[in-house]
Design a protein with these regions (language model features):
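Short, basic-rich loop-to-helix N-cap that marks the start of a DNA-contacting helix
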Residues: 47-60
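A short, Lys/Arg-rich alpha-helix, primarily the initiator
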Residues: 1-24, 71
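Short alpha-helical DNA-recognition segment
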Residues: 23-42
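The DNA-recognition helices of helix-turn-helix-type DNA-binding domains
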Residues: 36, 47, 62, 73-76
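Short, charged recognition helix plus adjacent turn
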Residues: 70-94
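The alpha-helix within a helix-turn-helix
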Residues: 19, 30, 59
Length: 94
């Protein structure tokens, strides 16, 4: 039986797993990593994706690997792309 649980966005994970436990607002995070607050707000609200530059800044600030946020974002994109795309299942490996 397949469970269709909604996949979190990278912005939700950034907020819930990194910002909230450390009591960091979007304003404070933007100031600390030297990016516009709108960039952080857009990521949190799923209006934009994490760029390489922002990923590197977030990684440095939160003490994770350089690719952590980009890898997470790409994993989420792949999982969401697979949902409901039956034609992918019809492709045969060579």
């Amino acid at each position: 039986m397949r469970n269709n649980v909604e996949t979190s966005t990278v912005g939700e994970i950034l907020f819930e797993e990194f910002m909230k436990p450390n009591n960091i607002s979007a304003y404070k995070l933007a100031k600390e990593i030297n990016v516009p607050i709108s960039s952080i707000q857009d990521i949190i609200h799923n209006r934009s994706k994490i760029t390489v530059d922002i990923s590197l800044r977030l990684a440095r600030f939160f003490g994770v690997s350089d690719k952590y946020f980009l890898d997470m974002q790409n994993d989420i994109i792949i999982r969401n792309s697979k949902k409901g795309v039956n034609e992918i299942n019809d492709i045969e490996e060579i």
